């Protein structure tokens, strides 16, 4: 952005680098839990400029995944956490997932920002068990960090806003990779995997089979399904 490169490291550090000189302007360490069951990877981060007057503290922010299933917002100029986002700059992505064993859910891909939404899924540990955490995709307010919608294939309706004590459907297909979007259409495109475990599907439910191995397009603002194309039946 402008004269600054923003990068993330395998340990979830975020650094701002002067694009001309290569000097580090600032770096931030979120003190991520990097235990033995966590992949040390970060595929990217996102930039968001808040509408005028929406945030005096962090008008420009970097929103990045943290290995231990958190999402953080940092001031793009200083690297300090945005206090108005979630809990002092962080939101926990394990909320609404029920019991999550260590290393069973984390995010390595950049969140997608479109239509004033921060949209992210997550990686679910393959081939470990059934009754694993949900693969639902969620959208958050980029200023406050509050959840706006969740796309949960096992829920009726599939798009809903979970409350503090709600749990998203377990064992559903996840979309852990890099998303793409079309701002003109207001759509976000998700590549889905399979419901866990990866290599046996005899127990899978009809909604698992329908949404596995698919390209999904959702209305970024509302989370409503707009397109579903299954690549493998």
Where are each of the predicted segments found?
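Repeat-blade elements of multi-bladed beta-propeller folds
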Residues: 1-11, 38-70, 103-130, 134-136, ...
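Extracytoplasmic/lumenal domain signature
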Residues: 14-35, 39, 47-49, 53-55, ...
